């Protein structure tokens, strides 16, 4: 039994055996944008490169929005998805599977979200978090496949966005995010 959060809504077919991720994981992007590898690469300490014949092959197919089919064999990994979000969720599952041990089980997982909107509300107007803390929250959201962040920045208790034309808005509440921090 696999301990995945959230549990896949589709099918999970386990087989005997396992495969280890190479030291540097190569990924064939296919028709997908490179940004969909960012969180995966960060979790593997940057040991991810794109290649024509990668250990992981991404294929664009007609399946549910944000859904994916992940196939792990001794020869490598295939991710089938309709969009970049599906790729992100599949690669999140790969990192979750490797967290259970050094090797990935030989498995095929079909998964798609039940709800299109899966989110978290972060009220930084009433309780300020640093930009680094917000980034950690976003990373944790990705790990459990949440796709919407409601970042509450303005209320009676505070104006948390730097406003260069009206600086008193943010200066009177003390702590705020610079425009550079918001952009990163």
What are these regions (language model features)?
Residues 1-113, 118:
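Acidic, contiguous N-terminal accessory segments
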Residues 63-184:
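Feature activates predominantly on carbohydrate-active enzymes
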């Amino acid at each position: 039994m696999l301990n995945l959060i959230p549990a896949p809504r589709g099918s999970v077919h386990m087989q005997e055996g396992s495969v280890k991720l190479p030291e540097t994981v190569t990924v064939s992007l296919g028709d997908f944008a490179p940004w969909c590898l960012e969180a995966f690469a960060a979790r593997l300490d940057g040991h991810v490169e794109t290649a024509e014949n990668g250990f992981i092959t991404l294929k664009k197919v007609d399946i549910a929005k944000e859904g994916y089919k992940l196939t792990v064999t001794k020869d490598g990994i295939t991710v089938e998805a309709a969009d970049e979000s599906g790729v992100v969720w599949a690669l999140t599952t790969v990192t979750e599977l490797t967290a259970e041990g050094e090797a990935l089980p030989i498995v095929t997982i079909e998964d798609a979200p039940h709800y299109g909107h899966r989110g978290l509300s972060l009220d930084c107007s009433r309780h300020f978090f640093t930009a680094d803390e917000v980034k950690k929250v976003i990373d944790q959201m990705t790990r459990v496949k949440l796709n919407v962040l409601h970042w509450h920045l303005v209320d009676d208790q505070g104006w948390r966005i730097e406003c260069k034309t009206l600086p008193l808005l943010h200066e009177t509440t003390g702590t705020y995010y610079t425009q550079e921090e918001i952009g990163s």
